[in-house]
Amino acid sequence: MLRSISFKIYEMRRYLILTLVVSMIAIPVADYLVIQRDRNRNEMYGEAFWIYGFSVYEMTDSEVAEAMGPPFNDGTHILPPYLGNITYEYPVFGLIFFAIATWLYPGVGGLQPLWLNFILVLVFNLNLILIAILLRDKLYTERWARLFFAGYFIYGLIMSAGGGKLEPITDCLLLMALVLNKEGQNGKAMVALGLSIQTKIYSVVALPILFLSSPISIIWFLLSTMLTVIPFMVGGARFDSLIQHFLNTSDYSTYIVNPMYPGLAFDTTNLIASEPASYIWPPALIPLAIYVGFMLFTFDRYLPEKEEFRAASWWDRILLLKPLYLYMVPAVLFLFRWVMPWYLFWFGGLIFLFKKNEHAIGYLKEITIIGFVYTLGILANWPYFYHGPLPDFVANFPLGIFSLVPLMLMIGVCIIVFGLWRWTINKQEEHTMKIREFEERGELVI
């Protein structure tokens, strides 16, 4: 894998320099435009780890901020009040990553938050290299591959330079696992996947596929997940907030911020009433209805041929159903109360596990449809979102509507970068086609 990464870095060196320049510009711009609570919070917990160890998992945000003092008690290093003043909900590897990152940078405050963005930007650019390795020639020949690459570029730039979130690290370890799996290094792939899950747990959806590739390699996965057991054994840590998140309890969040969540149709909280109350709102089912209709028309493309399925052994039948499993994974986004817009790309990396181009294209369309129904869900339940989740989300942009000006400039820069990259790719394709034409005519190409 290291050899592949080195070769791909050399091959894409010009584009990497360009993306790094764009990322460096985006870091201070985003820091000025957005209150990056996740980054600030991770910084606070990273510093607190060296004082309190794994017992930080037993402390709420407010308790940690009060114990750490300035600048962590300024209100921007904790999550909003509607999240119930929760404890740290991320698995162990993410905590250790930020603990090391804060240890490498002397002092607190000042440029330390930008330092965290910088590290995440480097990880994001490594992710672009890993994606290029997984796509191989498809990056130059398939339109869906270029669209996915462009989409991940914008997503990764926002998560690293504009959000300071854990997603780039999680994706990096997941992509490493997929590269190692393609190289036949199944044990190492499982170790990387285990670390990815312990950064943010959403990458667990890739575990069944990697397990089917080599069932015996699950041993390495279990060994790598021992990292999570250590806090339990040594510090008595608990992951109550993570469990509450998965159980969809109101203890995690008093708001339902997922506009696709079917529960809004039967129990939408009345945020205007002076006393706690709820009401029925049938339009909240519109996103689910559209998604179900889309899936009913498309899921049969991911089913194996009937004759092939009948003739296969029980194990081969399971393998034949892998595309269907991958296609159904994004449906879990409808099950949780807390789903933010960028969660749509959480399962983007699964696209590399499809062997057929038509399956990958269909999967990309599914993610697009989910993004559409997410937006439609906000409009369908506008009275609820207008009086609660949306104002709280917009509050993270201190400049208000004026934040759109530099934001549009950054989007414009991203479009220009993609245009330059696409232009060079087209020139390479034209050059390659001309060489083939000359060779077919029997001409000598020097």
Predicted regions and their residues:
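Hydrophobic residues within the alpha-helical transmembrane core of Major Facilitator Superfamily
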Residues: 118, 195, 227, 330-331, ...
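Primarily membrane-embedded glycan-assembly and transfer machineries that use lipid-linked glycans
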Residues: 2-179, 183, 188, 214-328, ...
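Aromatic-enriched
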Residues: 355-446
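Transmembrane helices and adjacent periplasmic/lumenal helix-loop junctions
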Residues: 191-212, 332-343
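Membrane-interface catalytic loops of GT-C/OST-like multi-pass glycosylation enzymes that act
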Residues: 162-167, 334-346, 382-391
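Transmembrane alpha-helices and membrane-interface helical segments
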Residues: 129-134, 172-183, 209-217, 333-336, ...
